[in-house]
Amino acid sequence: MSRVAKKPVSLPKGVELKVQPELVSVKGPKGTLTLPKPAGVEIAIDGDVATLSANDPSQIALTGTVRAILANMVKGVSEGFERKLELVGVGYRAAMQGKDLSLALGFSHPLVFVAPEGITLSTPTQTEIVVQGADKQRVGEVAAKIRGFRPPEPYKGKGVKYADEVIIRKEAKKA
């Protein structure tokens, strides 16, 4: 069996894991997440620990993947995930308008981004955006969508970048 699949998933206090024939749901203080249960992967719950096993040798790799997704779901409903973005450039600003995010990124018009359900956006400063939510995949997807409006360019580094991202700079053309 894969090394990832052998490791059990621990369930913190307040997190409830339900396994149905076609669906796996994780409920916690930050919400509820569901996952379609793949055929050939068995999930056994023993107290506050969930273990996964494969019914078929061809499903061993899938078992490791499902275990990683399940661990992220448990972490998401208990702690949540967040991704920070920074706006670099003169006149680049972000502001909240109710639940919508308004971005001034050098275009002739402000961009308005509507947060999907289950995702909260906040702007601690005019040049910072924080994306939070229980689903790791959706948090990353929303952050990537916002970054995609104006990705950082390599000459001056202007654009929307992840807080922990390092932009590799290029030297300007010599005359």
Swiss-Prot record:
- Gene Ontology terms describing biological process: cytoplasmic translation
**Keywords carried by this UniProt record:** Ribonucleoprotein, Ribosomal protein, RNA-binding, rRNA-binding
Q: What GO CC terms are in its UniProt record?
A: cytosolic large ribosomal subunit
Source domain of life: Bacteria
Coiled-coil regions, chain positions:
none
Give a GO molecular function annotation for the protein. structural constituent of ribosome
Tagged with keyword Ribonucleoprotein:
yes
What function does the entry list? This protein binds to the 23S rRNA, and is important in its secondary structure. It is located near the subunit interface in the base of the L7/L12 stalk, and near the tRNA binding site of the peptidyltransferase center.
Family that this chain belongs to: Belongs to the universal ribosomal protein uL6 family.
Assembly and binders: Part of the 50S ribosomal subunit.
The protein in question is named Large ribosomal subunit protein uL6
Q: Which organism is it from?
A: Xanthomonas euvesicatoria pv. vesicatoria (strain 85-10)
